[in-house]
Design a protein with these regions (language model features):
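Catalytic-site beta-strand/loop segments enriched in glycine and acidic/polar residues
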Residues: 15, 20-23
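Active-site-adjacent betaalpha module
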Residues: 2-16, 64-190
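Short acidic, Gly/Ser-rich segments with clustered Asp/Glu that frequently serve as metal-coordination loops
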Residues: 24-29
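A short alpha/beta connector and helix-capping loop motif
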Residues: 14-15, 31-57
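Short beta-strand segments at enzyme active-site cores
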Residues: 19-20, 55-61
Length: 190
């Protein structure tokens, strides 16, 4: 059973990185600048998660219509990563996902993906309601329209979800410059 205490910092031993619906047809309708930022930050977060042995979960919203997971995500998933298909907007409703999380025994959900105001928002709120510590990586989520993105951030804060950026996640996971992975991971952003 995951600990009941609420941590205000991302904890490498208690985190699970969840990539929500970064799929071909959703990415294709994002502004170029936005999708480039998402690609860069996805690379940083997945590289760090893999090096630090943080479990990774990816979800796909109705892949028949929205396509598969983008290659820039798929190429970084490892043999321990799990992918779940869903039709519900909240990833929590994907068949088997909640059971998998219970097996992992992680209390913190670090969320990134598409779209900010729909699937990321509903996933974050439902996980918060279930008692998880939810951190949304604000520079690793996106919406087609800026107003949708901004409204999602406001709503997430109102719901008690922690907002942070990619660098914050990375350095909270590392906690100290003496961490054995510090030099390799710091190169990703410096």
């Amino acid at each position: 059973m995951a600990p009941e205490t609420k941590s205000l910092l991302c904890d490498v031993k208690n985190s699970c990185l969840m990539i929500v619906d970064v799929q071909e047809k959703l990415s294709a309708v994002m502004p170029e600048k936005v999708i480039n930022r998402l690609k860069t930050n996805t690379d940083v977060l997945l590289t760090a998660a893999n090096q630090l042995k943080i479990p990774v979960i990816a979800t796909m919203q109705y892949p028949k219509g929205l396509g598969g997971i983008e290659n820039f995500v798929k190429d970084k998933l490892n043999e321990t990563s799990k992918c779940f298909e869903k039709t519900s907007f909240s990833s929590l409703e994907a068949e088997g996902l909640e059971d998998h999380l219970k097996e992992l025994d992680k209390k913190q959900i670090i969320l990134m993906g598409l779209e900010s105001h729909i699937c990321v928002l509903q996933t974050a709120i439902e996980f918060t309601e279930k008692g998880y510590d939810v951190f949304v990586v604000s520079d690793a989520i996106a919406s087609r329209k800026l107003t949708s993105y901004e409204t999602a951030l406001t709503r997430l804060e109102q719901a008690g979800v922690w907002l942070l950026n990619t660098e914050s996640v990375l350095f909270e996971w590392l906690r100290d410059a003496s961490h054995p992975n510090f030099k390799a991971l710091a190169k990703l952003i410096l």
